[in-house]
Amino acid sequence: MTATPEVQKSIEEVYTKLQGASDCSSLLKKHLTKDVVAKNKSKKTRLGATLLDVIQSGGENLDSGVGIYAPDAESYTLFADLFNPVIEEYHNGFKATDTQPAMDLGEKNVGELADLDPEGKFIVSTRIRCGRSLQGYPFNPCLSETNYKMMETRMKEIFNSITDPELKGTYYPLTGMDEETKKKLIADHFLFKEGDRFLKAANANRYWPNGRGIFHNEKKTFLVWVNEEDHLRIISMQNGGNVGEVLARLIKGLNLVAAKAPFARHPRLGWLTFCPTNLGTTVRASVHIKLPKISAKDDFKKICSDMKLQIRGIHGEHSESKEGIYDISNKQRLGLTEYQAVRQMYDGLKKLIELEKAAA
Ligand SMILES: Nc1ncnc2c1ncn2[C@@H]1O[C@H](COP(=O)(O)OP(=O)(O)OP(=O)(O)O)[C@@H](O)[C@H]1O
């Protein structure tokens, strides 16, 4: 199977557009070389995905940080000429010959994670999420409407079977959810945003809102997103800085779901996700934090990036910080264990709080 001449022409057009875009600094632009285009433009996965499916979001959104997505699991192998260097650069030097370590969520270590901010002076809230793909289904651009609905039905059955008093809750499909409820869930940081242009350009928003929804317990401290960017996003969050409590709840919830739904894992890349930035552990552990003194300094971004921390705005990726509150998380998700990913955030934040306390 080979890509049509039209698709190959579109791939070349994306390449030319990126090379001519002086304002673009995405990893796609850097690693989509003439040679990579020539070697890969005619390839097609067994499900029919091409290099165009991989690069079209970054081609349309020149402000992308990364710019590529995997339309199916095979893409990570078939288009390795592009994925491997992007993965290596994003995940702290994870090489094509490296392998994701076995899963270690840190069950035995949660006790080491004392509250980062017991006096409640800095941290507004803590959240740890991981992504999962259900075995047997491709990713967004290759999913049919029936696939989305079947996955949602399967997940509803699993949610209904949860009896743990802390975790049990209700699934709310996006279809039929009233605008007011939706807006409030998004504003309160519980639900994913709609109409993300990066995902739209990657063909990830088809048949919306069918098959999409959110499960949460009564306190909204354990949540599962269904069919947004990934098949599943499993989330634990609460106010304050008690990372240990948040992690313990995530582990409990993840184990419950995993016992009923087999997830797709790659022998080298770990848990599989739609975006290569989430491969491996898929863990993003974040706090919403106020650091008025050090965040005003010129070297704040550098201090964070030296500690492998990522800074986002208050409403998530591609949003701005408001009222001096930042979303700070681990950046690397591949090439370390789940516990180490959480620890990367934890140790870095401990240091940032010390610096804030010491700042004049
Ligand atoms: N520590 C936190 N406390 C409260 N809300 C949070 C925290 N971290 C992230 N959020 C909220 O979670 C929502 C999703 O954020 P965002 O999309 O950036 O991250 P994500 O779910 O990790 O996925 P992705 O990295 O794929 O974008 C946003 O509303 C964001 O404000």
Curated annotation (Swiss-Prot):
Keyword Nucleotide-binding: yes or no?
Answer: yes
Q: Which family does it belong to?
A: Belongs to the ATP:guanido phosphotransferase family.
Transmembrane ranges, per UniProt, are none
| CC terms in the record's Gene Ontology section | extracellular space
- Where ATP is bound, by residue? 125-129, 189, 233, 284-288, 312-317, 327
Quote the Pfam families the UniProt record gives: ATP-gua_Ptrans, ATP-gua_PtransN
The Gene Ontology biological process terms listed for this entry are: phosphocreatine biosynthetic process
Domain (Phosphagen kinase N-terminal): give its ranges: 10-92
User: Which keywords annotate this record?
Assistant: ATP-binding, Kinase, Nucleotide-binding, Transferase
Phosphagen kinase C-terminal domain residues:
122-359
Instruction: Give the catalysed reaction(s), semicolon-separated.
Output: L-arginine + ATP = N(omega)-phospho-L-arginine + ADP + H(+)
Stated EC number for the protein is 2.7.3.3
Organism taxonomic ancestry: Eukaryota, Metazoa, Ecdysozoa, Nematoda, Chromadorea
Q: Which residues bind substrate?
A: 65-69, 229, 275, 317
Protein name per Swiss-Prot or TrEMBL: Probable arginine kinase ZC434.8
Q: Which organism is it from?
A: Caenorhabditis elegans
Recall the GO molecular function terms of this protein's record. arginine kinase activity; ATP binding; creatine kinase activity; kinase activity
